[in-house]
Amino acid sequence: YRVPRTVHKVAQRIANRITVRRPKHYNPKPEDGTVHHIFEPDIEKFKKGDWMIMAQCNYMLNEVCESLKQHGFYFENRGYRSISLKLAIALDTWKSLVKGEEVTANAVKDLYYFMKSITRIKRGFKNLPNTQADDMFTLASLQENMGLLATKDMTWDVAMDKISEDNKTYIAALLRRGEDLNRAPRIKVSTIHGTKGGEATNVVLYLSLIH
């Protein structure tokens, strides 16, 4: 009883095309639900709600992921976030430091990961030697004791000079959209097989790829 009646009908029609499979009998939910046949997805529809985008094979999803990136959407592709949690933490860490707030040594390590030695960090300080995970630092204390060369007037994209230009452009688009990079993405992209057991309020299935 996981899907509405109209969705169940379409799912059964697709499943019946599979010649070698073990039949599974299940009933739909009591409500009707809706199914829309779309020839070209309206990318702006992904602004709200949770989404699951499916295709038959991994390589078929590459174009989908590229389109989502170009339009500044945060998504998960086959279990991997389009922006890693480490990078999301690094962005928040720099923002906190510029505000004058304290951050943990672990957070600083994530930040330093995206900074180049010599240009943003003095040699020998990349891994914060002689520190504990919960030690606290400010921008000033990092500059004085932990080799930080980046300065308060630098924006995140200047301070974290190890991030590629493509990723900087993408992150800027995400931030303009107000995406929360610390939360699990609303949009998930996967193969049909890979989404087994997954659920979403809105589902996009590339039927043209299934014969």
What function would you assign to each model-found segment?
Residues 1-210:
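The feature marks helicase ATPase cores and/or their adjacent C-terminal helical subdomains
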